[in-house]
Amino acid sequence: GIHAGGLRYHGMAPLVSHCKELGLIEAQAYHQTACFEAGVTFARAEGIVPALESNHAVKAAIEEALRCKREGKADTILFNLSGHGHFDMMAYTDYFAGKLQDLNYDEADLAQALAGLPAVPA
């Protein structure tokens, strides 16, 4: 299945959007199972089970660390661990049982859905 984890807010915060527009941050997208894997890696290394919404940031931080390792750099990597995953144990159980799946949405279906949205002034 699909796990809609975290804070149930799947939009973009205005401040985060503005920081991206200014080029201060980059947006990254990862499949849910890769994020769960990153959360498990973090838990095993740090002893903290991350909240599911934090796993996306953990995944990005791990990817940045691997990039630094490949490039021989010692960059500082900052990410937000928004909370613990103690209330998310059933989702972790589903992950370990192989019940979660990654889905790829068809670009044509996405374009059709977006075309049906009303125009909103900026």
Per-segment meaning from a language model:
Residues 32-96:
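Claisen-condensing/thiolase-fold acyl-transfer catalytic domains that form or cleave C-C bonds
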Residues 1-48, 94-122:
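Active-site/ligand-binding loops adjacent to catalytic centers
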